[in-house]
Amino acid sequence: MSDVHDDPLALLHWAQASRERGHHAFLLLDTAQAEASHLKLQSMHVPYASLFEGKREEALPEIAPLLLPLSGLDEQRALVLVRWVSQLGFAAPCLSWYESTLDLHDFAAHLRNFHHAGLSDGQAMMMRWYDTRILPIWMQALTKDQLALFTGGMLSLAFVDRFGEARTLYQSDQVQPPSQALPLDAPLVTLDDRQFGLLVDAGDLDALLTHLRFVIPDETNALPPRTLVEFVAAYQQRAREAGVDDIDRQTQYVLLALYTSGAGVEHPAVKALMQNPPDSLAGYFDALQAMPEEVWEAGPPLWENEHVA
């Protein structure tokens, strides 16, 4: 028997319930966040299917998304696997799990059909929807018909979010048919500009968070992760709305917000600047540095704010 320390996400209980319903339980591991996991799985004698199989990226097994059948493993291997992948899922945005009517071969074939997404200009892009920072945005961005296509063969989809919490993104009693590949591996899903923008914005937020953690590591580490992410997302969006769409100028704006718990950017001088922000980083940086001292003293740093949980 496992306990909460071995299986903090209760994956074994979920897999057992899936089996009792006559379904398969799968884990999906984005090994770009945990490189060379395929070697670990081989040493554990755990079967898997790579979603890169048959794709150009097939030559990169060390970073491939791997589909793992949990419900077909003996108790000991299942416990070892769950203990290991749970640690990975809490450490990096890499773990999701699926209940499906399909077997490993057929479910992997279905998921491979979403390796690329078409764009409105006729181009196609590799779609790393299995990165769990992107997965909820991907599900949100899809139209009703596209979502039905993507969730073919699925009864549920859940993942570990960026805050280390398990979230269910999809659950249904009705199973849609699995997708069928198009000739010449053409994308099954084409994103319009709005959908593409949602996915780009999600990537931009992570890029800005990474940059801020590099610039002020101690300060960002002092904040609860949810507080930091939600605060940065809100002020990045305000910067975008003012036409500040590059990460360097956004960093300067968000730093002012962080160092003043948001009060500094409400100062009339900053609001006036954001009506017509300089296009260059140097010009924008100089304009912020030239602000009166009261701007930078408008509020306490967010990490020293006693009202921040």
Predicted regions and their residues:
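A contiguous, surface-oriented mixed alpha/beta subdomain in the mid-to-C-terminal portion of proteins
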Residues: 1-62, 67, 72, 78, ...
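Contiguous, structured surface segment used for ligand recognition
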Residues: 69-73, 82-89
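Short, cationic low-complexity segments
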Residues: 91-95
